[in-house]
Amino acid sequence: MYIFETKLWPVGTNIACLILGLVLPKLGNSIEDICDTTNWESSQRKLERGKFITDNTIIRVSFAYLYRIKSGNKYLLVKNERGTGKYQPVGGVYQFDEDERSNLQRLFQIIDDNKMPIDESSRNDYRLRMGNKYLRKFIKYFDKQKKRENIEDLSREFREELIEKGIINWEKISYRYCGRHITDLQFGEHFQTYEILLADIVELLPTESQRNDLKSLEDKSSDQYRFATAEEISSFGVNTALGQFKDEIANHTVKILEENQCKLSKEMNDSKVYTVKI
C-alpha cells in the first residue's frame, strides 16, 4: 500500500500543477480585468497581453480642454494656427507651471513631444511622451495636480483665440464642465506612435448681451472663424451635394457636440458654474 501511494503521488502532483498552471493565469487576467475600470485601461491591458507594447514602450499623451460655444443650432469654431487651416473648437492643450516640469521629469521621466513644434508658448504643454509603465499613475496625478491650468480658470485659450484677435470683446465669461472624452490607448496613424488623447469639454454660458454678440458674429463673414451645424461638424465640413469635398473641420471637433454628450465621462461636478475674468 505504501509503495502504491508513493508511485501515485508524483502523478497527482503533476496533474494538480497542470490544472493550476491553466487556471491561475486566467484567474489573474480576470482580476486584472475587474481592476480596469475605464475603456482606455482595458485597451492598454489588451496591448500588453498581445505583446504589442511593453513597460518601456514610449506613449504620447495630449491633454486638452475644449469649449462648446453655441449660437442657435450652430457651434463657433476658430481656424487652427498650426498650419492645418482647419476649423476647430476654441481651446487647446493644458499647460503646467514652470516649477512642475522638474516634478514630471522626476516622477514620470517625461520627454517633450517630438511630433509638434515647440516654442515658448507651447514649452509647458501637456503634450508629452513617457514610458507605458508610468501612464496610469500619470493620469491619476494629472487629476490631482493643481500646478497646472484647472477647471477654475480656463480663460487662457479663450482669450488668445477670441479676445486678442478682436473677434469678441468681453470682460468675463461663465462656463460649466460637461465631461471628459478620452480615447483608447492605440496606435495613431497620423504620428505613427502609440498615444492617448484626453479632452475636457466645457460649455460657455453666455449672458443675453453675449448671445447677441455671437448672433452678430454669425451674420458676418470671416476667415478667422465659422459657425457650423452638428451635421457639418460630423462630416468634417464635406458636402458632396454642394461640391465641397475638402474637409475644413478638424476631426476632434465632434467631441464638443451635444449629440455626443453621452460619450463623456464625469470626472467632476457638472452643475457648478465657473466665472472668470478675461
Model features per residue range: what roles?
Residues 1-278:
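N-terminal leader/linker segments that precede catalytic domains of diphosphate-processing enzymes
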